[in-house]
Regions:
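Conserved PRPP/pyrophosphate-binding segment of the phosphoribosyltransferase/PRPP-pathway fold
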Residues: 1-123, 130-159
Length: 159
């Protein structure tokens, strides 16, 4: 799992505005700092995807912040961005404010994947806290036949 920055200070403010206040103009900056971090290591992936939102949250927010970052990152990496490989199969509570045990219970079994057999997938998210979402997404992709899953986020909370 790779994260570009600790989730505090300016990065926290930018990600909060990006996610909750329609500040989508930050997408290029966020994609670039994640690209810069990933460029420090070998990221041998075939495709890029992102942590999906449930369709009801997508309608409410109007966009998926992870998808916007993934679009920028895929362009910089020269990799195909796939919107169809991950799906959130049920609604969950927002993870914000939940403790570790509730986060795990809340997100367990919430994702399904397809179209990734024999593919290495780079999955993008905005922030990682406990890593439970990353684990669940990785399990869904592996179950669908992905050979490798690399999880990358802009921010990483220190808990």
């Amino acid at each position: 799992m790779t994260s570009a920055a600790v989730y505090d200070g300016l990065i926290k403010d930018i990600l909060h505005a990006f996610k909750y206040h329609n500040a989508t103009f930050y997408k290029a900056f966020l994609g670039k700092i994640l690209f810069d971090e990933l460029s420090k290591e070998e990221v041998a992936c075939d495709i890029v995807s992102f942590v999906p939102l449930h369709w009801t949250r997508m309608i409410f927010r109007g966009y998926n912040q992870a998808a916007l970052i993934a679009r920028e990152l895929s362009r910089l990496l020269g990799l195909e961005l796939r919107f169809d490989v991950l799906r959130k199969s049920r609604r969950t509570l927002p993870q914000v404010g939940l403790g570790r045990a509730l986060r795990k219970k809340n997100i367990t079994g919430a994702f399904c994947a397809s179209g990734v057999a024999d593919r290495a997938v780079l999955v993008v998210d905005d922030v990682v806290t406990t890593g439970q979402t990353a684990r669940e997404v990785s399990m869904a992709l592996k179950k669908a036949g992905a050979t490798r899953v690399v999880f990358a986020s802009v921010g990483r909370m220190l808990i």
